[in-house]
Every structure is written in structure tokens, then in C-alpha cells.
Amino acid sequence: MKKFHGLILTALVTCLIIPFSLAASAETNENGNNSTPTEEKTTDTTENIITEEKTEPAEPTKDTTVTPPQKSKVQTTIDITDSQEVYSYEQNSKIDLKDFTATLTDYTDTKLTNYRLAANSKLSTAQTGIQEVTLLGDNEDGKTTAVKLNYLVKEKTAQLTITDMNFDLETKIFTGKTKPFASVYMSSPADENFGEGTTTADKDGYFYAEWATTPKQITAYAFDESGNYSEEVTYQVPAKKQNEAVVTAPDKVKKIETKNAVKSATTKPTDVTKVTKDDKTDLPSTGDKGTEWIFVVAGVIVILVAVLLLRKRKK
């Protein structure tokens, strides 16, 4: 019985202790749960705030990066057409893309590579005046940049000259000097002595031409196979020999016929001969008329003689 009462007492004490221990543990759990969520919430809030601050400035930076392409579009064409004397050429002279690209950086302040002609652009010196052309090149970023420029085409100046002109009144040989092996065209005024022809200068540049008659003046200009030429010069042929210079011409000299020389040498003698033949053919008829008059006179004389003889017989 004593053991039984002891067990009951132990059970009662245990029942009294368990509620108090459960209550204490409950308070401890409540305090721990309240502090932990607060820290998590605080941490989460801080992280959200930091994330929002980073994302908001990032959007304006993206907007600012859009502007550089707009600036590059404005600068894709470089116009230097206001410098018309930068490049100049003579008419019909050679022109090449390298003529521009070699020094183009000095005028554009922009280094470009892989130069080429833009569409509908060409290089030509056929027409005089200011010509406009557009070139394309690649910058350091690989983007295409257009360079708009112009060049001046001037009228070609004479490269050859004709000097030492002389006309020998005795031999009628016209001489002068120009570039060796150049061609020389010469002509006289368009009158009765008009003549024209082309001769070639020798290895020393001297040229010779023999005229059929003596013209009043001779106009000449020289040109070569490269397209060079001289100014047109006019030589006034003197009426009398003005110097004692002796012209030593080669054996074969270009002969220039004139209209007057052709007529006097061929047409006129032929006409005279024809007229003479025609006159001779007419002479027989004129001779016949002369012979008739002789017979008439002879008949009159015979009649007079017969009359005289008849009178003598009557006496």
C-alpha cells in the first residue's frame, strides 16, 4: 500500500510540473519567432530598396547611349566642296582615285580606308569647269563615311612651240622648228593662192615645206601623238628677201600645191593649146575666102585685058 501511495504522489507532482514547463517553453518560442521574422523582413526590405536604386539609374544610361548613333549619322558625310582649288586638272588629262585619297585626310581631318566611288559618281576631265564627286571610305569603327568634294578642270595649255620661221623667196621653202618628230599643219589664206598640208619635223625639230607659189602669209601649228599641241602662229611672208640666210633643205621636202599654181601649171596651157587648135581648124575656111577674092581680082584683070585687045583689033 505504501508503494502504491508513492506512485500516486509522484504522478501528481509530475502533473503539476508539466504545465509550468510547457508555459515557459511557449513564451520562449513566442519571443524567438517575433525577432526572427522582423530581421528577415528588414533584410528583405533593404535588399529590395537597393535593387530598386540600381535599376532606376540603369534605364537613363540606356537612353543616353542612343544619342551617339544620331551624331554619327550627321557626320557620315564630310563636305569639302568649298575648296575648289584643292584639286585641279587640265582638260583631257589623266585622273585617278589615288590623286584624292593620298592627301584627303589633310582636308577632312578624318582617317578613312578602302576608298571607292559612290554610286552615280565618276572621275572625268572631258568637261572644263568645276566637277563634283562623292567618295566612300571606312572609318576606324568600320562604318562607311562619304566625302563630298569637287575638282577643277582647266582648259589645256599649249605644250609645244613653233620658232625660227622663215620663207625663202627663191626656193619657196618654208622652214621652222618645233618638237622633234612632231607634225606641223600649215595653210595660206583662202584666196587664189590657198594651199595647205602637213609635214613632220626631223630628229632636231626642223621642218620644211615647199610651196608652189609665194603666199602672203602662212599659218601653222604643231601637235604630237600624245595630244600636245602648240598655239596657232602666223608668219607674214616678206615681199623682198630680208636676210642672207641660206636654207639647206633635205632632198625630200613636203610640197604644198596652191590653187593658183595648179591652174597656171595645167589648166591655162591646155586651154591655150585648145584655142590654137581651134584657130587652126578655122583657118582653112578663112583661107578659102581669101582664094575667092584672088580669083575675082584675076577675073577682073582678064576682062580688062580682053576689052583692050578688042579695041585694038577694031582700030
UniProtKB/Swiss-Prot annotation:
It is found in: Secreted, Cell wall. The keyword Repeat does not apply. Keywords: Cell wall, Peptidoglycan-anchor, Secreted, Signal. Residues 287-315 form a propeptide. Residues 27-76 are annotated as: Disordered. Pfam families: Gram_pos_anchor (PF00746). Residues 66-76 have a biased composition (Polar residues). This is Cell wall protein Lmo2714. It comes from Listeria monocytogenes serovar 1/2a (strain ATCC BAA-679 / EGD-e). The lineage of its organism: Bacteria, Bacillati, Bacillota, Bacilli, Bacillales.
